[in-house]
C-alpha cells in the first residue's frame, strides 16, 4: 500500500491574516476572478502542520502567485521567508515575482534569492493579459535562466474572463486553459530553447495541456498558423517535454502526461488550503491508487523534487531533515 511518508508538497499557499482594508482588496481580486465561494482561508502554521502530519507531508513550499507590483511582492516574500526561517525543516517558500514590472522583478528575484534564501519562484500564467511568449518577460526569464532557477507557474484568470467563464468561477474551467495558453505562447516564441536552464513547474498537471499538446504539435506548424520562428512539431514536443508538472487535483492526468514527458518530471502538490478537505482527500487517494506510476517511480518523486529545487535540498541537509 502506497503512502506519502516524507513527501514534499510544492504547491501550497500561505494566505495572510488581513486587515479590513486588505480584505476588501482581496475580495475585489476574488470577484474579478469570479470566485463565488468564500474568500481564501487565512493561513495558520499549526493548522497547516496538522494537515501535513495527517497526510505524511514532510515539508510544504509556500507561495502566493498573485499578480502584484514590486512593493507588495516584497511584503509577501518577507513573510514567506520568515515562516521558512521559523521552521526550516517543515516550510520553504517560493518568492513572488512582480511580473508587471520586469526590471523591478529582476531586482526582487536577486533580493529573494541572495538575501532571503528563496527555494525558487512563483508567477502567474499571465500579467494583465500578457502571456509568456511576449518580450515583456525576457528580462525575468533571462535572470531565472542565469540562476538555473525553478519557477512554479500557477494559473490565473485570462483577460476577458467575463466573456468566457459562463458565469462560473475561474478555477472551475478557465484556470485549466490559461496554463496551456501561456505555455503554447512561450513554445512558439522558443522561450524554453532560449532559456534552457530555467526549470518551469506547471501547477495542476499543466491544466488542459496533457489533452491538447498533441493537437498543438500537429496543427501548429501548418502554413496557415502564424509561426514566425518556424517551430516544428518536434520542437513543440521537445520544449514541452522539458517542463515539470505538479499534480494537485490532477491525478488522472499522470497517464496522459507520461506520453509527453518522463516520470521524473512529475511532482507532488496539494493546493492547500484552497478547495476543501474532501477535494484534498479525494485527490491524494486517487494519486496513491494511480497505476500510471509504478512503485519505483512513485517513490522517486521526492528525488525529482529536490533535483528541481536544489536550494531546498541544501537547506534540508543543513538542518538534518534529509
Language-model regions: role of each:
Residues 1-59, 107-111, 198, 244, ...:
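Mid-to-C-terminal alpha-helical segments outside catalytic/metal-binding sites
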Residues 4, 13-42, 158-179, 216-240:
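Active-site gating loops and adjacent loop-to-helix segments of metal-dependent hydrolytic enzymes
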Residues 58-186:
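Active-site gating/metal-coordination segments in enzymes
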Residues 176-181, 195-197, 222-277:
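Active-site-adjacent C-terminal substructures of enzyme catalytic domains
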Amino acid at each position: 500500500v502506497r503512502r506519502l511518508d516524507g513527501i514534499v508538497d510544492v504547491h501550497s499557499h500561505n494566505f495572510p491574516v488581513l486587515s479590513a482594508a486588505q480584505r476588501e482588496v482581496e475580495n475585489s481580486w476574488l470577484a474579478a476572478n469570479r470566485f463565488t465561494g468564500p474568500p481564501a482561508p487565512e493561513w495558520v502554521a499549526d493548522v497547516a502542520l496538522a494537515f501535513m502530519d495527517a497526510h505524511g507531508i514532510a515539508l510544504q513550499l509556500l507561495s502566493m502567485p498573485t499578480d502584484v507590483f514590486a512593493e507588495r511582492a516584497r511584503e509577501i516574500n518577507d513573510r514567506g521567508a520568515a515562516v521558512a526561517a521559523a521552521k526550516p525543516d517543515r516550510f520553504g517558500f517560493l518568492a513572488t515575482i512582480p511580473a508587471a514590472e520586469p526590471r523591478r522583478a529582476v531586482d526582487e528575484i536577486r533580493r529573494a534569492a541572495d538575501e532571503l534564501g528563496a527555494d525558487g519562484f512563483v508567477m502567474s500564467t499571465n500579467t494583465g493579459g500578457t502571456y509568456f511568449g511576449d518580450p515583456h518577460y525576457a528580462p525575468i526569464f533571462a535572470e531565472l535562466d542565469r540562476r538555473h532557477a525553478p519557477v512554479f507557474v500557477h494559473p490565473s484568470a485570462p483577460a476577458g474572463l467575463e466573456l468566457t467563464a459562463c458565469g462560473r468561477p475561474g478555477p472551475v474551467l478557465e484556470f485549466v486553459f490559461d496554463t496551456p495558453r501561456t505555455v503554447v505562447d512561450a513554445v512558439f516564441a522558443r522561450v524554453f530553447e532560449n532559456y534552457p536552464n530555467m526549470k518551469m513547474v506547471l501547477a495542476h498537471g499543466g491544466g488542459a495541456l496533457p489533452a491538447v499538446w498533441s493537437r498543438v504539435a500537429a496543427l501548429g506548424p501548418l502554413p496557415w498558423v502564424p509561426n514566425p520562428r518556424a517551430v516544428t512539431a518536434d520542437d513543440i514536443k521537445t520544449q514541452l517535454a522539458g517542463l515539470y508538472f505538479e499534480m494537485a487535483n490532477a491525478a488522472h492526468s499522470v497517464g496522459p502526461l507520461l506520453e509527453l514527458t518522463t516520470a521524473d518530471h512529475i511532482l507532488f502538490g496539494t493546493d492547500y488550503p484552497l478547495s476543501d478537505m474532501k477535494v484534498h482527500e479525494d485527490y491524494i487517494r486517487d494519486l496513491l491508487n494511480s497505476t500510471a506510476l509504478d512503485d519505483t517511480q512513485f517513490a522517486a518523486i521526492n528525488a525529482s523534487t529536490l533535483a528541481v529545487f536544489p536550494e531546498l535540498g541544501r537547506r534540508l541537509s543543513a538542518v538534518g531533515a534529509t
